[in-house]
Amino acid sequence: MLNMGFENNSDTFAIILRPALFKDKQAGDNYLNNTPATVFRITPNKSTKLDPYNYPELKVRGTGKTEFDLMDDLEQLRNAILNKYNDLNATELPTSIAVPSGSDAIQRGIDALGPDNDACYLWTSTRTPNLPTSPFPNLSQYYDFMPNPAITLGNATNEFIIVYGVNHVATGKATYENFVLYGADAWNGVGAIHDTEFNGTAEEYLPDNPNAKYLYVYKIARNCNGDPHCFEVPTGPGAYGIGLDQPLFIAWRSYLEKATKTGPSYSEIVYDRAIKFDPKK
């Protein structure tokens, strides 16, 4: 399925590593700051008969066990969040699958943005992108997939986003999960919140619910005012931040269900959610 070569119809491909949560932070920094390998492109001097690898046997997603028993608890959490901030305007953001599977995208000639079979991808959008593959994606085309009007984050005291949902690591559906805030103009991720920071965050809202340990709540704001469960969004410099009037979106990644050793099944997880709050006019 990989069409290598130099012709106009040859594929461009990449191998991407996304390390996180190093046990030894200094060793991790050393690894990131010093390229640990070199990649060579080797072209034979003589033409040879192709002997391509077979398509690998895929690990099957899903166990039949779902997170849907937590739907009532999640609705209680939603109501608790809305009640806590009932003096503010609340806009509930949509959630959908962020990318199609790689094999689906290859067969349809659409850009799947490099998905991994070992993960589930969600984002705050109404639908999954299905744009044609091109050498240099025009990210403005993705505006059609964003909420309308666009979601921005100003610096007003009572303007923020609450991200909440089921902690897929706590339920056993993933071994690692995060969410990332992106600027929609350049798809610049400005910060990732990992599942290690989810623990205990829902108990404040559901103190008497024993299933609160399977849920999480996290705040995104311009000024967190000391809140330990809050990500403070920078405005720059450049792609290191998101402007006050720049549209944004949130994306979630959940990796590797232990029982299957591949990505969770979308049909077995409860989708993560987000609510934008701002002052009532």
State where each predicted segment sits.
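A compositional/structural signature for long, glycine/proline-rich flexible linkers
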Residues: 1-281
